Design a protein with these regions (language model features):
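Transmembrane helical elements of multi-pass membrane transporters/channels
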Residues: 10-25, 172-175, 179, 183, ...
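Signature of the first transmembrane helix
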Residues: 3-62, 87-101, 116-121, 151-160, ...
């Protein structure tokens, strides 16, 4: 099977597993949420926030270094596995011993015990970091997707059974641990690595992984900066308005890019020594991503008044402008995310960190200025600062990937032109349907948008459907 076929198979299997797992998770959550108290979810949310940040440090990007490395010896893998165990178990012990501080800050002794038990995740993760990385390195996406689905199913069922037994908050904690245990066991069983606790010769892996881990920690700050700024200067209702608007706008991106990046990273790592082929595949991927993301996200922006009215209700009318603005920028953010994943895939972790620092400087500064004009000012600052960040980071990323910026622009051009016409037609259609009920107006505008976009993008790029058929055939091979 060619690398292209493996990548397409990965998208198919990963996407299918994510969809099935998400549906099952939602179904179980709807039952469990009626059995537990809101405080139970609050305690677990605080614990999860702490564990997730420390886990980024403990993992130290070692898994990514295994996937990205051009060549690896068995002894090196064994040493990386040993280092992963030492780091995770040590930091897990530190967090567990520091858990009593949670009582001081939050005044809840249950949180202390939840954090301490949740630290078992560090021990489980340590055992599977290298085996999981090996599975992705070999691009065995069918197996990785199956493991994630099985582990998610176990976690959901364990949580449900424990909740039915009256376990309270421990249903969430132990259910998550059950899924993590199964996940680690399956990866370890399929790609066993015996750890060696000698760490010589790992400087390159530690440098790459440490840089990547630092970048991830910085992204934690960047991703929360707007909400923290809003919480400091705006009312709680305004914060809720902003966060819900951004959540709606970024939800498609989170779902799609979680799948795409999981496949893009190992694929780029495999192609890093064949730059012409990498360039061709990356530009093709950006073109197809824009073909899908532009009509979806610009469509959401165009019909934002109807979406807000039907999904959120009249009290959320002020969410229309934030949703419109944010949705317009998401296709560019998605393309940038693919490029960012690609530069890590070719080993340029330092450049990824430099790009993250640009985000860390520009975005929070813009938020502090924009928040003076409330929610609309904050989302406008988000959009304008994102344009600045892309202008500063994308050109140098393309240079590192040996891809001309003009070629990237050409790959996005046709969907953007068709999307722009679609947007204008939908806005004109809304004016013509001003007196029609929201639900009928929304359905009509969606159909009008599709009727405009699909023929126009086909006219601008006559090969797009042939490309899609070719990819579909390759994914079945």
């Amino acid at each position: 099977m060619s690398i292209e076929q493996q990548a397409l198979s990965g998208l198919k299997w990963t996407g299918s597993a994510r969809l099935i797992g998400q549906v099952l998770s939602w179904a179980v959550t709807l039952i469990v949420v009626r059995l537990l108290a809101p405080a139970d979810y609050g305690i677990v949310a605080v614990s999860a926030a702490i564990i997730s940040v420390i886990s980024t440090v403990a993992e130290l990007g070692l898994g990514a270094s295994v996937v990205q490395a051009p060549a690896l010896e068995r002894e090196t893998l064994a040493r990386i596995a040993g280092l992963a165990i030492v780091l995770n178990w040590s930091l897990g012990a530190v967090v567990a011993l520091s858990a009593p501080l949670a009582v001081v800050f939050f005044g809840d002794d249950v949180l202390r015990r939840v954090i301490q038990v949740s630290c078992l995740h560090f021990g489980l993760a340590a055992l599977s970091i290298v085996p999981e990385a090996l599975a992705y390195r070999t691009m065995n996406f069918k197996w990785t997707a199956s493991i994630d689905l099985i582990a998610g199913l176990v976690a959901s069922l364990a949580t449900l059974l424990l909740a039915l037994k009256g376990a309270g908050v421990w249903a969430l904690v132990l259910g998550s641990l059950a899924g993590a245990t199964v996940r680690s066991a399956l990866f370890l069983g399929s790609h066993p690595v015996r750890p060696v606790f000698r760490f010589g010769g790992l400087r390159g892996h530690v440098a790459f992984g440490g840089t990547l881990a630092t970048s991830r920690l910085a992204w934690h700050v960047v991703n929360q900066a707007d909400v923290f700024t809003a919480a400091r200067f705006l009312t709680p209702s305004a914060v809720g308005l902003y966060s819900v608007s951004l959540h709606l706008a970024t939800l498609p991106m989170q779902r799609i890019m979680g799948i795409v990046n999981q496949v893009v990273f190992p694929t780029v790592a495999r192609l890093q020594d064949d730059r012409p082929r990498l360039r061709e595949r990356l530009l093709s991927g950006l073109r197809l991503l824009a073909f899908v993301s532009v009509p979806v996200m610009w469509g959401i922006s165009a019909v934002a008044p109807e979406i807000v009215a039907l999904a959120l209700g009249p009290r959320w009318h002020d969410a229309v402008y934030p949703l419109q603005v944010a949705s317009l920028l998401i296709p560019f953010k998605m393309a940038s995310a693919v490029i960012s994943t690609a530069i890590v895939g070719v080993g340029a972790a330092t450049l990824d960190l430099r790009n993250t620092v640009v985000n860390l400087v520009v975005l929070p500064s813009a938020f502090l200025i924009g928040v003076r004009w409330g929610v609309d000012g904050l989302v406008t600052a988000w959009a304008l600062s994102l344009v600045v960040v892309l202008a500063l980071t994308v050109p140098r990323s393309c240079t590192r990937l040996e891809i001309a910026l003009l070629d990237v622009a050409r790959s996005l051009r046709d969907p953007l032109l068709a999307g722009g016409v679609m947007y204008a037609v939908v806005l004109a259609g809304r004016a013509a349907l001003a007196g029609v009920p929201h639900v009928y107006r929304l359905a009509t505008l969606v159909l009008v948008g599709a009727a405009v976009y699909l023929p126009l993008v086909s006219l601008l790029n006559r090969t797009i459907w042939a490309d899609l058929r070719r990819l579909r055939s390759a994914s079945r091979a």
